[in-house]
Amino acid sequence: KTFSFPLGYAEPFNIQHYKPGEGFFSWHCERGMHQTHQRALVFMTYLNDVTDGGETQWLYQGKEMKPKKGLTVLWPTDFTHTHKGVVSPTQSKTIATGWYNYLDVRAIAG
């Protein structure tokens, strides 16, 4: 089943490419600063397979997801879903990340 959000409730997505040994490996959440307080959900799509590290870990859930090309993960942006990426020492990792908001971001931007 598919779903859609009205135009404006989704921010443009970002593509991040991490070389071996790189990554966003600090615990963080996707909401909290003034610029991000309207975020409700984050999605992340893995754009390649990573077999040596590269997992996404969620602190309070005690869960992790192995990168598999085409897999999309969706979770709340709040501190309840604090997460981090595990660095792969030997492989690159490419992801697309985006956010769905409580408010129409076009109205916020003015």
Locations of regions flagged by a protein language model:
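Fe(II)/2-oxoglutarate oxygenase catalytic core
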Residues: K1-T72, T80-G110
